[in-house]
């Protein structure tokens, strides 16, 4: 029977949830959720000087926005330090690690001499095979005994087989002289203890895999499945940085991108399923696999992100979309909508969501429904309200006051009125938009009338006719 899949996301709490980290978390989440497995969260907070509670919270908030729920309790790597140290002592007792008394000055002198002579700077400790009786009463580190012959093969699900000669591996430090464990050891022990079966992470960790395999093998533990995914680059092909724009997941939340669209885009960033660009969360969970991840760095493309976000907004249920739009206003520091405005936003949703790519665009398109009387037209719309058009609106309004308020009937009334004026409805649209919304670019006049209702529509037309 195949063991259940267990993946993990293991960020360091030294800043916000980077867009690359968000994608790594998403890939792990999709792989586990699509296979009925577990997705675990570990905070790698061993660097006490740089780790902060605020950064941890920012990571959690970013994951919550993206809907990446984790199983079980959050694991703190720092809290497991005693366990990591105990494992190092196990290896020492088993003869698979040793005490090294070399000082930093001695190691630095060795490397300087090696560079000067054109030799490898890989440090070979003279203490590896030293008898215990020769050990001085001095500070020491614990080093693993790296294999000195043969090869280590990283069987990676994305990069393929990566072979490293064992004579290129050093006797890595496991425990510092102050008794604290190093990151390499902590990661292996935590992944083992958490039951992680698949390690999906950035390919900047690929070289670490060979060193971590030394620890797995020395302990007789099963090595997890490796999947080292390519990094994200900017549109210019260079590593993603601030010059390319926003880097943090929450920055995109504050800018008003829908979480579903961001999930879809991040999933497609380096992974593909045929020619499918737009897909639902359920489809992503079903389709996601490691075989579909490419080796080359993916390029972040804001236009593609916006396109997918627009499709997700258009496909969303109106009630859910209204809730998301209001949540966006809260996180971006904007005033909450009144109960009346919230109701009107919900009514307008059907006619504004088709072309909005972000929540600011969506709310802007709902301006006609959210604004209060009297409607003040902007400069461009005001040009449509000259004396002639005001007179036309004044004449039109009585014909609407007792009308049956359905689209077909409203279209018939306005087209007949335009015909009576020996013109086309298009000529009336400008003044009507200005009167109803105060703008020249709006949803269709008929949609605005249906959303506003007969009383508000006629009141706005009367206001504009004065």
Curated annotation (Swiss-Prot):
One of its GO terms (molecular function) is ATP binding. It catalyses: tRNA(Glu) + L-glutamate + ATP = L-glutamyl-tRNA(Glu) + AMP + diphosphate. It comes from the Bacteria. CDD domains: GluRS_core. GO terms for biological process: glutamyl-tRNA aminoacylation. SUPFAM superfamilies: An anticodon-binding domain of class I aminoacyl-tRNA synthetases, Nucleotidylyl transferase. This is Glutamate--tRNA ligase 2. It comes from Roseobacter denitrificans (strain ATCC 33942 / OCh 114).
């Amino acid at each position: 029977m195949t063991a259940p899949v267990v993946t993990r996301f293991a960020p360091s709490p030294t800043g916000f949830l980077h867009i690359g980290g968000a994608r790594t978390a998403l890939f792990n989440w999709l792989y586990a959720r699509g296979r009925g497995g577990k997705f675990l969260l570990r905070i790698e907070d061993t660097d006490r000087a740089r780790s902060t509670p605020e950064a941890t919270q920012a990571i959690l908030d970013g994951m919550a926005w993206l809907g990446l729920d984790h199983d079980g309790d959050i694991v703190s790597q720092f809290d497991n330090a005693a366990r990591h140290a105990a494992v190092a002592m196990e290896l020492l007792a088993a003869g698979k690690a040793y005490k090294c008394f070399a000082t930093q000055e001695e190691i630095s002198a060795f490397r300087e001499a090696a560079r000067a002579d054109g030799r490898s700077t890989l440090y070979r400790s003279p203490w590896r095979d030293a008898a215990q009786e020769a050990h001085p009463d001095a500070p020491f580190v614990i080093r693993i005994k790296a294999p000195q012959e043969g090869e280590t093969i990283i069987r990676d699900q994305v990069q393929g087989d990566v072979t490293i000669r064992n004579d290129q591996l050093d006797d890595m430090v496991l425990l510092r002289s102050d008794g604290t464990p190093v990151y390499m050891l902590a990661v292996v022990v935590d992944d083992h203890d958490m039951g992680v079966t698949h390690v999906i992470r950035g390919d900047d960790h690929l070289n670490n895999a060979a060193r971590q395999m030394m620890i797995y093998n020395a302990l007789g533990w099963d090595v997890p499945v490796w999947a080292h995914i390519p990094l994200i680059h900017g549109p210019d092909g260079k590593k993603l940085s601030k010059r390319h724009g926003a880097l943090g997941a929450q920055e995109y939340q504050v800018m008003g991108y829908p979480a579903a669209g961001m999930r879809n885009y991040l999933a497609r960033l380096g992974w593909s399923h045929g020619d499918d660009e737009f897909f639902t969360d359920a489809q992503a969970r079903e389709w996601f696999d490691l075989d579909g991840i490419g080796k080359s760095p993916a390029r972040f493309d804001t236009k593609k992100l916006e396109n997918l976000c627009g499709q997700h907004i258009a496909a969303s249920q109106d009630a859910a979309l209204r809730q998301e739009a209001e949540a966006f206003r809260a996180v971006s520091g904007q005033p909450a909508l009144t109960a009346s405005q919230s109701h009107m936003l919900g009514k307008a949703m059907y006619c504004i969501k088709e072309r909005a790519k972000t929540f600011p665009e969506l709310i802007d398109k709902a301006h006609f429904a959210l604004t209060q009387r009297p409607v003040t037209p902007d400069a461009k719309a005001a040009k449509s309200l000259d004396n002639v058009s005001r007179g036309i609106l004044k004449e039109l309004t009585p014909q609407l006051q007792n009308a049956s308020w359905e689209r077909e009937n409203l279209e018939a009334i306005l087209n007949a009125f335009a015909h009576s004026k020996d013109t086309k409805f298009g000529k009336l649209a400008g003044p009507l938009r200005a009167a109803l919304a105060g703008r020249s670019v709006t949803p269709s006049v008929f949609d605005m009338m249906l959303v506003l209702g007969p009383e508000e529509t006629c009141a706005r037309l009367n206001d504009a006719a004065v």
